[in-house]
């Protein structure tokens, strides 16, 4: 039995979500909508990827459909989600345009016949979920939900382990974040955020992020205890979180490592990784974990004040969690 899904927006996340879905036998993508990419271009963009490499399966255009590994996927080019035909057969929609991020806007998919919508971005008003952290809060009456951000997906599992074991009094997060599609290749206008308009390939760019504060939405008692910022760097993929926290309970760095390793092998297996290798960013391209703790990179100032480092493939890891969230809610809804 599979859950039939649709993808709205065939950009970076939309395409990687499709790749990730092909590895999950419980998900079948049956429709893709993107008004800016025609069918032949979809074939090309899915087949070739500068970061994740050439798609190892088969992909072609046939009879007006995108055929991946022999399975046809209906293709549409509607600008308004409510205009996507109800006959597409997709009960669950991954909203990955980056445009429709509120319950009202993403909810337009429901008009077209969808049962549920997962926004692949933070949302101002939709309930946010992080796999491994707060899935138990989902209920079947929720129609539009958010998978939060890639950075929140990296930070929240790590913060959960530390808070559960030692208690977090307060903390600051910095994410050293890979370039994304919204940045400029060369200097250009960028509204009120002047720094964001500087060339992505030539600069380290300080930026705001709500990722740390969003942890308070998925772990409510941490609300107000964490905040953070970002540095956008000239790196095509893989980012890293630097979490500096003050602990309630004194702990050696060895104690902290042991707690994270235990979680990575137990309750958070497949979500939170653990490594003691001498790793760098490219070692995590294509890693499906939400967060990979770097045991050798962290430092402790004293038993109550520590800096923790965790890597994440901000494209592939995040997209894998979108698929996991889809499967989870489908099971709760009785669709799987």
UniProtKB/Swiss-Prot annotation:
SMART domains reported in the protein's UniProt record: Gp_dh_N
Reaction catalysis annotation: D-glyceraldehyde 3-phosphate + phosphate + NAD(+) = (2R)-3-phospho-glyceroyl phosphate + NADH + H(+)
Sites binding NAD(+) sit at 12-13, 34, 79, 314
Which InterPro entries does the record associate with it?
A: GlycerAld/Erythrose_P_DH, GlycerAld_3-P_DH_AS, GlycerAld_3-P_DH_cat, GlycerAld_3-P_DH_NAD(P)-bd, Glyceraldehyde-3-P_DH_1, NAD(P)-bd_dom_sf
Which molecular function term from Gene Ontology is one that the record holds?
Answer: glyceraldehyde-3-phosphate dehydrogenase (NAD+) (phosphorylating) activity
Location of this chain's protein in the cell: Cytoplasm
Pathway of this protein?
Carbohydrate degradation; glycolysis; pyruvate from D-glyceraldehyde 3-phosphate: step 1/5
Feature type site, description Activates thiol group during catalysis:
177
Q: Where is the active site?
A: 150
Residues that, per the record, bind D-glyceraldehyde 3-phosphate: 149-151, 180, 209-210, 232
Q: Which GO terms describe its biological process?
A: glucose metabolic process; glycolytic process
As recorded in UniProt, its EC number(s) are 1.2.1.12
UniProt entry keywords in alphabetical sequence: Cytoplasm, Glycolysis, NAD, Oxidoreductase
Q: Which GO terms describe its cellular component?
A: cytosol
Q: Which family does it belong to?
A: Belongs to the glyceraldehyde-3-phosphate dehydrogenase family.
**Assembly state and interactors?**
Homotetramer.
Protein name, entry field: Glyceraldehyde-3-phosphate dehydrogenase
Q: Which organism is it from?
A: Rhizomucor miehei
């Amino acid at each position: 039995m599979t859950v039939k899904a649709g993808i709205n927006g065939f950009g970076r996340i939309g395409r990687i979500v499709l790749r990730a879905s092909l590895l999950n036998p419980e998900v079948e993508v049956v429709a893709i909508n993107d008004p800016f990419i025609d069918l032949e271009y979809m074939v090309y963009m899915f087949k070739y990827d500068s970061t994740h490499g050439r798609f190892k399966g088969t992909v072609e255009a046939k009879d007006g459909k995108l055929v991946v590994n022999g399975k046809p996927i209906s293709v549409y080019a509607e600008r308004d989600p409510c205009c996507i035909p109800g006959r597409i057969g997709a009960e669950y929609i991954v909203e990955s345009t980056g445009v429709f991020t509120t319950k009202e806007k993403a909810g337009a998919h429901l008009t077209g016949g969808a049962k549920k919508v997962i926004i692949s971005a933070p949302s101002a008003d939709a309930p946010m979920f992080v796999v491994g952290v707060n899935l138990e809060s989902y209920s079947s009456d929720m129609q539009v939900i958010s998978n939060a951000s890639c950075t929140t997906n990296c930070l929240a599992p790590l913060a959960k382990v530390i808070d559960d074991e030692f208690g977090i009094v307060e903390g600051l997060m910095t994410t050293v974040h890979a370039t994304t599609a919204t940045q400029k290749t060369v200097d250009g206008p960028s509204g009120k955020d002047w720094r964001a308009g500087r060339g992505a390939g030539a600069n380290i760019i300080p930026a705001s992020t709500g990722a740390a504060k969003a942890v308070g939405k998925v772990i409510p008692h941490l609300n107000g205890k964490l905040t953070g910022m970002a540095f956008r760097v000239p790196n095509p993929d893989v980012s890293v979180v630097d979490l500096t926290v003050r602990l309630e309970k004194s702990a050696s760095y060895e104690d902290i490592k042991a707690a994270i390793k235990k979680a990575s092998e137990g309750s958070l297996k497949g979500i939170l990784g653990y490594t003691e290798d001498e790793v760098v960013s490219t070692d995590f391209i294509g890693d499906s974990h939400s967060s990979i703790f770097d045991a050798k990179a962290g430092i402790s100032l004293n038993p109550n004040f520590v800096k923790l480092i965790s890597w994440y493939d901000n494209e592939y890891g995040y997209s894998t969690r979108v698929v996991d969230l889809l499967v989870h809610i489908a099971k709760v809804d009785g669709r799987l």
